[in-house]
Regions:
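Bacterial N-terminal signal peptides that target proteins for export
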Residues: 1-7
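Charged, low-complexity intrinsically disordered terminal segments
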Residues: 4, 16-384
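Bacterial N-terminal signal peptides
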Residues: 8-16
Length: 384
C-alpha cells in the first residue's frame, strides 16, 4: 500500500511542475438544446452537421477507433476537408491504440490537422513522464462552424455507437463558442499553430448554457457538485456509470438527503470495468443508510453522465462521479440554467429510472472483499 501511495504522490508532484490553464465561462443565453440516448441517432445527426459545415470543424476526442463508426466519421471529415473546410482533431493516443498511426496520417494527407494529447515533444519533462501514467483527455467535443457543439459520453467506436446506451447533447448558439474556447486550450497546449479567429454567433433559442472544463489537479468539479447539492431544495437526481466520489462530494450527497432533499443515484448493475463494480457496490449500503435512493439498471449498459436538480439546473458531459474525472482527467460538461433544459434532462433520467430496480438495505456489499481491501480500493482510486 505504501508503494502505491508513493507512486501516486510522485505523479501528483510531476503534475504540479507543469501547470495548465483552463478558461472559465459564465452562463450565456440564446441557445437550443437537443439530446439523445442513442449512439446511432447521435452519429446520424452529427454526420448531417458535418456535411453542412462551411468553415471549421474542431474535435477533441477520448476514443476514435478505425472501425465502422470511426470510419464513417473519418470519411465525412475527408469529404469536407476536400471542400476546403478547416479541420482540427485532438485525440488521446493512449486510449486509441486500435487506430494505427496511418489512420490519422491519412487524415493529415487530406489537409486536416491532427494532434495527440500525449505529445511528448510538446510537453515539459514532468508532464511527459506523468501523462502515460496519469491523466487522460476524457473530453468528447465537436464544434462545427463555431455555432454548433456536441458533448456527452459517446466515443467514436462501434461499442459506444451501436451497443451501449449513452447520452449526448447538441447545442446551437453562443454557448458553442465556449466549447470552442475549451478546445483551443487543449490545442494550444499540445499542437502547433495560432488560435483560430473567433466566429460571431447569433442567438437561436432560449437555453441558458455554461461550459465547464477541467484539467488535472483542478478542483472545479468538486466545488461545483458540493455547491449544487448544497443549493438543492426539493430533489437532486444523478446518473453515472462509475461511483467512487471524492469525500467532499459523498458528504454533500449525504447532507442533502439529511435536509430532506430527494437524492437519487442511478448506475448500471455491471460496468465495463470489473474493478469499479466492486467499488460501486461497496457504497450502496452506506448510501441507502444515509437516506439516498439508489437505482440499478440491469439492461444494456448505460454510460450516461448527468444530473438535474429542482427543475432549474442540469448538467450533461463526460464527467464520471469518480476520482479520475474529478482530479486527474481533462473533462468537459455543459450546465443548463433554464427550466426547459432542466426538464429535458429530468425526463431522460426518469425514463431510465423507470426500467431500474431500487435497492434496499438488504443489498450486499461487494462479495469476496474484506473491509480492509474495500477501504484500500476507495483510497487508491481517489488518488490515481
Amino acid at each position: 500500500m505504501q508503494k502505491h501511495k508513493l507512486i501516486s504522490l510522485v505523479l501528483l508532484l510531476l503534475y504540479w511542475l507543469c501547470p495548465a490553464q483552463v478558461p472559465r465561462f459564465e452562463p450565456v443565453g440564446g441557445n437550443t438544446l437537443w439530446m439523445t440516448k442513442s449512439g446511432e441517432e447521435y452519429l446520424n445527426r452529427l454526420l448531417q452537421d458535418i456535411d453542412a459545415a462551411r468553415t471549421t470543424i474542431e474535435m477533441e476526442y477520448y476514443w476514435f477507433d478505425a472501425d465502422k463508426a470511426g470510419k464513417l466519421v473519418r470519411d465525412a471529415l475527408v469529404k469536407k476537408a476536400r471542400e476546403g473546410v478547416k479541420i482540427r482533431i485532438l485525440v488521446d493516443n493512449f486510449i486509441t491504440p486500435g487506430s494505427p498511426e496511418f489512420y490519422f496520417e491519412q487524415m493529415r494527407r487530406e489537409g486536416m490537422q491532427v494532434a495527440y494529447v500525449h505529445n511528448l515533444e510538446k510537453m515539459c519533462p514532468g508532464k511527459a513522464v506523468a501523462s502515460f501514467f496519469g491523466y487522460r483527455d476524457h473530453r468528447k467535443i465537436v464544434v462545427i462552424d463555431g455555432r454548433i457543439a456536441y458533448t456527452g459520453g459517446i466515443n467514436f467506436n462501434n461499442q459506444t455507437i451501436y451497443v451501449w446506451k449513452d447520452t449526448q447533447v447538441r447545442i446551437e448558439g453562443p454557448a458553442a463558442a465556449q466549447m470552442r474556447a475549451l478546445f483551443e486550450q487543449g490545442w494550444a497546449d499540445l499542437a502547433d499553430g495560432s488560435p483560430a479567429p473567433e466566429i460571431p454567433v447569433e442567438p437561436v433559442g432560449t437555453a441558458l448554457v455554461q461550459t465547464v472544463g477541467t484539467v488535472s489537479r483542478d478542483t472545479t468539479l468538486t466545488h461545483l457538485y458540493v455547491q449544487k447539492l448544497a443549493e438543492a431544495k426539493e430533489y437532486f437526481y444523478l446518473q453515472t456509470p462509475y461511483f467512487g466520489p471524492p469525500p467532499q462530494v459523498l458528504q454533500a450527497l449525504k447532507d442533502a438527503a439529511a435536509r430532506g432533499v430527494d437524492v437519487r443515484l442511478l448506475f448500471p448493475e455491471k460496468c465495463d470495468w470489473g474493478f469499479m463494480n466492486s467499488l460501486t457496490r461497496d457504497y450502496i449500503p452506506e448510501l441507502i443508510a444515509s437516506g439516498i435512493r439508489v437505482f440499478v439498471f440491469n439492461g444494456v449498459y448505460d454510460h450516461s453522465k448527468l444530473f438535474v436538480s429542482d427543475d432549474r439546473i442540469a448538467s450533461c458531459g463526460t464527467v464520471n462521479l469518480d476520482g479520475r474525472s474529478f482530479h486527474t482527467n481533462w473533462e468537459d460538461a455543459l450546465l443548463f440554467h433554464d427550466r426547459e433544459s432542466a426538464l429535458q434532462v429530468k425526463e431522460s433520467y426518469l425514463n431510465v429510472q423507470a426500467e431500474c430496480i431500487e435497492m434496499d438495505a438488504s443489498y450486499p456489499q461487494a462479495k469476496g472483499l474484506s473491509k480492509a481491501w474495500r477501504k484500500f480500493l476507495r483510497k487508491i482510486y481517489r488518488i490515481l
